Swiss-Prot record:
InterPro entries in UniProt: AP_endonuc_2, AP_endonuc_F2_Zn_BS, Xyl_isomerase-like_sf, Xyl_isomerase-like_TIM-brl
Its job: Endonuclease IV plays a role in DNA repair. It cleaves phosphodiester bonds at apurinic or apyrimidinic (AP) sites, generating a 3'-hydroxyl group and a 5'-terminal sugar phosphate.
Binding site for Zn(2+) 3: H179, D223, H225
Source species: Mesomycoplasma hyopneumoniae (strain 7448)
PROSITE patterns in the cross-refs: AP_NUCLEASE_F2_1, AP_NUCLEASE_F2_2, AP_NUCLEASE_F2_3, AP_NUCLEASE_F2_4
Residue positions binding Zn(2+) 2: E143, D176, H210, E255
Cofactor names: Zn(2+)
Residue numbers binding Zn(2+) 1: H70, H108, E143
Protein name: Probable endonuclease 4
Free-text remark on how the cofactor is bound: Binds 3 Zn(2+) ions.
Coiled-coil ranges (or none): none
Transmembrane spans: none
Catalysed reactions listed for this entry: Endonucleolytic cleavage to 5'-phosphooligonucleotide end-products
């Protein structure tokens, strides 16, 4: 089954109910939300989510397991200085996600900034273990990154090493097509790309895909998303990811730019699903 959707706005007054309504208007059957502003840890109480309205009207069309939650960008579980704050926040975030019944929490692995990469890697593994020990149900997904600055997890071997070191069925990977392209993985050589996923074992942990085109050439380490078919990856390659059996039942989530201050996810989803 093809599961496809986009990032949708989780905001007052309708929160979850409004977000899933927007997804359905885009002809999607999956969705991704932030539980608050992406650059902030501010959160409203779960009783404001309008979960009962969602449950009554939209539960069957987009069930909770196909609602992906993204952690805010400002946390850094790989930093020995910021880890405690990040970990405490993520434990509370998972409690809110369990209220919804969503299955996956995507998070950026963090930066090693003023620390060595090895120190940051050990801290990240420790953080993930601690968060999982204090929570239940939700699966943490480390997102593949572009390699910009001191970002962690810009190559498949590193992200798999971290996932396997955590030793939990509640840890996995979210692959971002723009990020891996910018990190130097040539998706346009599709057979070789799929071979690399198998070789590094990343495919064993892949739970969600962020489906984005890239404004930048291969290996640029820029992380600038483009609309579907308007970047260097191209529609043909992104459509292969939608339809290839290797990625069956994995939710594909668009995070592409707005056009004239409006999302065009409905058009992009239709474009991707169009068989040629």
């Amino acid at each position: 089954m093809i599961k496809i959707g986009s990032h949708v706005r989780f905001r007052k007054p309708d929160y979850l109910f409004g977000a899933i309504q927007e997804s359905l208007e885009n002809k999607a059957n999956a969705a991704m939300i932030f539980l608050g502003p992406p650059q902030s840890t501010f959160r409203v109480k779960p009783e404001n989510y309008k979960f009962q309205d969602y449950q009554k009207h939209f539960f069957k069309q987009i069930p909770p397991e196909d609602i992906i939650v993204h952690a805010p960008y400002i946390i850094n579980p790989a930093s020995p200085i910021k880890a405690q704050f990040s970990n405490d926040f993520l434990v509370k975030e998972i409690e809110k996600i369990n209220y919804i019944g969503a299955k996956f929490l995507v998070l950026h692995p963090g930066f090693f900034t003023s620390f060595t990469k090895e120190v940051a890697k050990k801290q990240l593994i420790s953080s993930l273990k601690s968060i999982l020990e204090k929570t239940k149900n939700v699966i943490l997904l480390l997102e593949t990154m572009s390699g910009k600055g001191s970002e962690m997890c810009a190559n498949f071997e590193e992200i798999v090493e971290i996932v396997e070191a955590v030793e939990s069925p509640r840890i996995g990977v979210c692959l971002d097509t723009c990020h891996v392209w910018d990190a130097g993985y040539d998706l346009k050589n599709f057979p070789e790309f799929c071979k690399e996923l198998r070789k590094t074992r990343l495919i064993n942990y892949l739970k969600v895909i962020h489906l984005n085109d890239s404004l930048s050439p291969l290996g640029s380490k820029k992380d600038r998303h483009a609309n579907i078919g308007k970047g260097f990856i191209g529609l043909e390659t992104l459509r292969k990811i939608v339809f290839d059996p290797l990625f069956a039942n994995i939710p594909k989530i668009l995070e592409t730019p707005y056009v004239d201050n409006k999302p065009i996810y409905d058009q992009e989803i239709a474009l991707l699903l169009k068989k040629v």
